[in-house]
Amino acid sequence: MITSKKVKVCFFIIFVFLNIFYIAPSYSLSLREDLFKNALDLSSRGQFNLALQEWNRYLDYYPDDAAGLSNRGNVRLVIGDVEGSIDDQNKAISLNPTEIDPYINRGIAEEASVSYTHLTLPTTVRV
């Protein structure tokens, strides 16, 4: 026999599942967008150490985001972590091989690696 108590319990269970599957993902998407935007804004403003922390935080939540990895790789290159930059670009390429940006960014990082390792400065300067 169906009682009003059973109906209330059924509605409650349906309500809980709807919240889990419809409301939670939209919150998650907003959090994702907010984290990405914050990291990108810090990068654009030249606050690279803070940007690196934010990209790390973002990638803790979304480790398979190729764009996030590529952007973190760019920040790593700017602060002098050339090998870390190349690693991030390689991961981004493996996740999304049709995206061109990580290939370009990896090439820039590899060029920087070669340029910096073979760079010799003159010991005397002529005026």
Model-found features: residue ranges?
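Register position in tetratricopeptide repeats
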Residues: 44, 78, 112-113
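Conserved structural position within tetratricopeptide repeats
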Residues: 57-60, 91-94
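Helix-start (N-cap) detector for alpha-helical repeat units in TPR-like alpha-solenoids
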Residues: 32, 66-67, 100-101
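Conserved small/polar residues in nucleotide/adenosyl-binding loops
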Residues: 117-123
